[in-house]
Amino acid sequence: MVLIRVLANLLILQLSYAQKSSELVVGGDECNINEHRSLVAIFNSTGFFCSGTLINQEWVVTAAHCDSNNFKMKFGAHSQKVLNEDEQIRNPKEKFICPNKKNNEVLDKDIMLIKLDSSVSNSEHIAPLSLPSSPPSVGSVCRIMGWGSITPTKVTYPDVPYCANINLLDDAECKPGYPELLPEYRTLCAGIVQGGKDTCGGDSGGPLICNGQFHGIVSYGAHPCGQSLKPGIYTTVFDYNDWIKSIIAGNTAATCPP
């Protein structure tokens, strides 16, 4: 079974496949408190349901399937029970999803750009992550992180974000596990071929960080999480660099690559 990585307590459309319910990092360890300064917690009145990535003081990138009404974003958070002094909360001022996205295909252009209602300040626990300067290389060791489930079957949400290292894999290693993947979906495949480390329910929208740059957005994967031969699927940020930069520059009519 394949699942979109959004919180399990949210309504998930019954499709032939679904995106990961806000998944937690399976097979990881508690993140160092200062290593996830760009990680954004997205929540509403029912609680946390997705993550995002701060790319500058006014903009956040997440997955399009994380779009929801009346959500807020928390910056600088670590423990959900103990506040950091520099935590900041913002509302979305504007949201941008690719105008040429095929709405009936959950994997197509799974990216959303959010303008904040006011800028956030850099601090000990808050800093933006750089957009990629070039495509990532197969074999790269990449970092995943999030407050998603840390167990693959029974949902177990941690108080703090978990992090893990995984490998960027060749598309050919993903195709057998995900025959529905098409080249036009512009995705990356990352994980451990033998399984054991993966994003999971609650991690949707969070970053895949390779060589210190923001290369992927948690989008899609298998359920249970962490299966062998079924790594996670991530939206390729590099392919949307021009769209992101155009929107930020004020060209709100910009379209995404086909």
Curated annotation (Swiss-Prot):
Active site at which residues?
65, 110, 204
Under the heading Gene3D superfamilies, the entry gives:
Trypsin-like serine proteases
EC number in record: 3.4.21.-
- Carbohydrate-modified residues are 44
UniProt xrefs under CDD domains? Tryp_SPc
SUPFAM superfamilies in alphabetical order: Trypsin-like serine proteases
Task: Output the InterPro entries linked to this UniProt entry.
Answer: Peptidase_S1_PA (IPR009003), Peptidase_S1_PA_chymotrypsin (IPR043504), Peptidase_S1A (IPR001314), Trypsin_dom (IPR001254), TRYPSIN_HIS (IPR018114), TRYPSIN_SER (IPR033116)
Tree of life domain: Eukaryota
Q: Sum up the protein's function in the record's words.
A: Snake venom serine protease that may act in the hemostasis system of the prey.
- Kindly state the subunit structure of this protein: Monomer.
Q: What is this protein called?
A: Snake venom serine protease 1
What is the source species? Craspedocephalus gramineus
Q: Which gene is the coding source of this polypeptide chain?
A: TLG1
